[in-house]
Amino acid sequence: MKIDSLFNIQDKVAVVTGGSRGIGEMITAGFLANGTKVYISARKAPALVDKAKELSDKYNQECIPIPCDLSSMNGIEEFTNEIQNKEKGIDFLINNAGAAWGEPLESFSEGGWDKVMDLNVKSLFFLTQKFKNLLLHNASEEDPSRVINIGSIDGLNVPSMETYSYGTSKAAVHHLTRVLAAKLVKENILVNAIAPGPYPSAMLGSAVNHDYSEIAKRNP
């Protein structure tokens, strides 16, 4: 079954934060393969630019890199302003950029708490706030604009690792999604979240080459 047999996203515009690797890259590739222009962000400019060119060439579709640090309000405003200067409206906002921090309870640092909460929760809220007008521009009752927040299974269950701020942040993402969904549905903007489980990615760090058999047993 092809996506275009279910719905058509040809010539639409998407914003994917953290779009240069992991789940963000997969989402970006899916949009590009189906004719959507995509803006992607990441902190590391060279890798972001290289990935955008790679994806653009592969799918023969525009993938525009905007390097920025979305953990700060300055970074959020620079990112949103740049897209506002290029587009009258957007159809999709994928709040994917995130961070994790692992440390024993007894020594868990304020920096490890704030870094994760700022990027995983604060930036998600303010990006949605600042992109609202662009989402409204393209939204209609027949074809709503959409916000997709990337949560985590660790926001629903008790995490197996000592990633206290990460699990807490993702629980906040899931509840904030409900709150935003109830507010924005009245304006033809649909807000949803997904809750991925563990998979090999740069965020897992040393766990990328981990034996996933035990984790798989706990996955229903």
Describe the residue ranges of each PLM region.
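Conserved glycine-rich cofactor-binding loop
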Residues: 13, 20-21
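Active-site loop-to-helix junction immediately N-terminal to the catalytic Tyr of the SDR YXXXK motif
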Residues: 108, 158-167, 179, 207
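Residue(s) in the substrate-gating loop at a strand-loop-helix junction
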Residues: 152
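Substrate-binding pocket helix/loop in short-chain dehydrogenase/reductase
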Residues: 104-105, 109-117, 204, 212-216
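A glycine/serine/threonine-rich, flexible loop-to-helix segment
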Residues: 162, 186, 198-220
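Active-site helix of classical SDR
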Residues: 128, 169, 177
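Alpha-helical segment proximal to the catalytic Tyr-Lys
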Residues: 133, 182-183
